[in-house]
Amino acid sequence: MTLKLHDLRPARGSKIARTRVGRGDGSKGKTAGRGTKGTRARKQVPVTFEGGQMPIHMRLPKLKGFRNRFRTEYEIVNVGDINRLFPQGGAVGVDDLVAKGAVRKNALVKVLGDGKLTAKVDVSAHKFSGSARAKITAAGGSATEL
């Protein structure tokens, strides 16, 4: 027997009929699951209504401030991280930091001055803090902004 389009039926239990309320005296008849009397039985009330209690959206504090849409976010790398990832020194660029897993790809990189630097490194990044620039130059390296 070949399968025809008119023989197709949805899987059992996948389609559940919508409960029709207020039709006769059955389980969802008469009061239709609304109880007896009161506002909720006679008309709809908002979902947020809590029966005279102070609603949750008014109990919570308001959010202050704003989020600047034009802020530039930088991935942070400390001088100590560079020292740990590149102990031999040399030229360190953003691509090298991505390859070592220190920063994400296509991210702007800022170098901060936390930690010690022992090897001479020539770092190129998008931004440097003053202390990071001082530590890199003190170790004999150079800090180049992209």
Curated annotation (Swiss-Prot):
Where in the sequence does UniProt note compositional bias of the Basic and acidic residues kind? 1-10
Q: Which UniProt keywords apply?
A: Ribonucleoprotein, Ribosomal protein, RNA-binding, rRNA-binding
Show the Gene3D superfamilies listed in the entry.
3.100.10.10
Q: Any keyword Amino-acid biosynthesis?
A: no
Q: Which InterPro entries does the annotation name?
A: Ribosomal_uL15, Ribosomal_uL15/eL18, Ribosomal_uL15/eL18_sf, Ribosomal_uL15_bac-type, Ribosomal_uL15_CS
Q: Which GO terms describe its molecular function?
A: rRNA binding; structural constituent of ribosome
Q: Which SUPFAM superfamilies match?
A: Ribosomal proteins L15p and L18e
Cellular component aspect of the GO annotation: cytosolic large ribosomal subunit
PROSITE patterns recorded? RIBOSOMAL_L15
* Region spans: Disordered: 1-41
Q: Which GO terms describe its biological process?
A: translation
Hey, which family's this protein in?
Answer: Belongs to the universal ribosomal protein uL15 family.
PANTHER family linked to this entry? 50S RIBOSOMAL PROTEIN L15, LARGE RIBOSOMAL SUBUNIT PROTEIN UL15M
Q: Which NCBIfam families match?
A: rplO_bact
Subunit record text: Part of the 50S ribosomal subunit.
| Function comment | Binds to the 23S rRNA.
| Protein name, per record | Large ribosomal subunit protein uL15
Q: By which gene is this protein encoded? A: rplO
